[in-house]
Amino acid sequence: HAPAVAQLVAFIERAEQTALGVANQHGVAALRDNPDAMGTSLDMLRRAAATLLRLAEHAANRPLIRRHERRLLSLVMSQILDQKVAHELADVLFHC
């Protein structure tokens, strides 16, 4: 599961970085009107966060997720990331 956790976190980070770029260049309204401009859909981001949460609910996976604790915390505190995604990631940290 270690590569899966790293890939899921990286996927969310890439979307956040792209969203920041779109927001800086075109404004937050452009991102709100067209969330797919971040390179993926909100649904896929929410699924990635939900998958991380399901993994975190199993004690055996928690050490794998703890390796990415700082990255997850950074995403939780993001000003641009979808609030549902951020909330799920906060729950991931809570379980770990």
Where are these regions (language model features)?
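Alpha-helical solenoid repeats of the armadillo/HEAT superfamily
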Residues: 1-67, 80-96
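Amphipathic alpha-helical scaffolding segments
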Residues: 67-74
